[in-house]
Amino acid sequence: MADEKPAYTKPLPDLRPEDKPFWEALKEHRFLLPRDDKTGEPFWYPRKYAPGTLGETSWMDASGEGTVYTYSTHFIGPSKAYKGDPPHIVALIDLKEGPRMMTILVKDEPGYPSLDPEDVTIGMPVKIVFDDVTDEITMPKFTPAG
């Protein structure tokens, strides 16, 4: 019983048909990006048609590496589920493959606690970590690389 993971009480993403492969890959601890089949360029966020060309899309394996473009320290969460939590860092990450993605910065420790604000810098290299918040949902978060 002591090893039992506490129930996840924070909001979960709304899963849509066009991003189903993304969430399924995360459960396997793989990071995918959608790409434009006409240009081969990856983009973020998943959607049915590619931005710019409105062409068909497919999925590509991605490195899960990037750098912090900008960040904000949030002292109050977006819902009551966050009451009493320490500040968390919401960041825009320039992914190695090109797209920019919004995420949470965390420590690479059990439970993925929030990164301390003083440990974050613009341009800081980061890598993905996979937070298995429920049996169905794994959240992509990022932690300092190296």
Residue ranges and their predicted role:
Residues 1-32:
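A broadly conserved sequence feature marking short terminus-proximal activation segments
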Residues 4, 98, 103-146:
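Well-ordered alpha/beta subsegment
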Residues 26-65:
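Cys/His-rich short segments
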Residues 52-54, 75-80:
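A short, acidic/glycine-rich surface segment
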Residues 65-67, 125:
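Residue-level marker of beta-strand positions
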Residues 71-77, 131-133:
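Short, conserved beta-turn/loop elements at beta-strand boundaries and strand-helix junctions
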